[in-house]
Amino acid sequence: MNHMSDPTTVKVAVIGSGNIGTDLMIKVIRHSRVLEMGAMVGIDPDSDGLARARRLGVPTTSDGVEGLLALPGFADIEVIFDATSAKAHAANAALLQPLGKRLIDLTPAALGPFVVPAVNVDEHRDAPNVNMVTCGGQATIPIVAAVSRVAPVAYAEIVASIASKSAGPGTRANIDEFTETTAHAVETVGGARRGKAIIILNPAEPPLIMRDTVLCLATAPDPATRSAIRESIEEMVARVAGYVPGYRLKQQIQITEIPPDQPVHTLAADGGPAPTHQVSVFLEVEGAAHYLPSYAGNLDIMTSAALRYAESIAATVTAAPADQGATR
């Protein structure tokens, strides 16, 4: 349980009382020693997320961001998680950023820089608005980065397969933004010269655990380089599992030579060395079942990543003088 009304904690609000927002709220309450729930914000007064928040003693509003601004404790809230939709986040940011609130965006809006904690948690500590990419991005970009820090990656493709039951209306409304934002982050954070992202909502019953496939076309003609790629991936998997315990390799890492007649130039970005090998990584992400059952690893990796980043900036937020809020 977090420390209620502890002056050393940072008060946070969650906008969006759906699957992601509710899971995040539960994580803050149960597991964070430096964050304290200051508000849960929704637009549906009958939503399960708002009902749970009320039962847990968290201040709530069903009037969206306007309702948040009107809450008595709003001035004390330093960090705001946005778990709504890409379109809604743009409107929310326009209202909240001028007030000096730090925004952590869990939608694919990508108004601020991308943060994938295992790769670049320290790069954007002072950014007023950061974007957590997507669940598929949080699961796969660390792997692309693990390869690209050892060998050039001409092309990286990620496929995220999630249980249909775990995808709420916000996720479904953002499918196009999901693929665009994830592909962009595969390049900018993962280090691939060209990136592609695919999401699959699997309707199988019983629901299947989140599965992710990462394919990288890399320049690794030397056996020592290929060995270093394996070690780099294994180290990265362990790093992500440090904050997402259900994150693991589903199969052994596969590195295969690209046949000479394979037209990989149609995928690879122009310029740079020609790829010699395909690196295939198969992942499974089991959820912690804080809100939805354990098949919803996509919720877990997204909210765990956001929590990790928020906790990493908590000391910065508490150290900043209150009158500098608008310039932080």
Curated annotation (Swiss-Prot):
Q: Which keywords has UniProt assigned to this entry? A: Aromatic hydrocarbons catabolism, NAD, Oxidoreductase
Listed Pfam families? AcetDehyd-dimer
Q: Which GO terms describe its molecular function?
A: acetaldehyde dehydrogenase (acetylating) activity; NAD binding
Is the Nucleus keyword given for this protein? no
- The UniProt record gives the binding positions of NAD(+) as S17, G18, N19, I20, S166, A167, G168, P169, G170, T171, R172, A173, N174, N298
Q: What class of enzyme is it?
A: oxidoreductase
Enzyme Commission code:
1.2.1.10
**Active-site residue list:** C135 (acyl-thioester intermediate)
CDD domains from the xrefs?
ALDH_C (cd23933)
Q: Which reaction does it catalyse?
A: acetaldehyde + NAD(+) + CoA = acetyl-CoA + NADH + H(+)
User: InterPro entries given for it?
Assistant: Acetaldehyde_dehydrogenase, Acetylaldehyde_DH_C, NAD(P)-bd_dom_sf, Semialdehyde_DH_NAD-bd
Q: Which GO terms describe its biological process?
A: catabolic process
Name the family the entry cites.
Belongs to the acetaldehyde dehydrogenase family.
What is this protein's name? Answer: Acetaldehyde dehydrogenase 3
Organism field: Nocardia farcinica (strain IFM 10152)
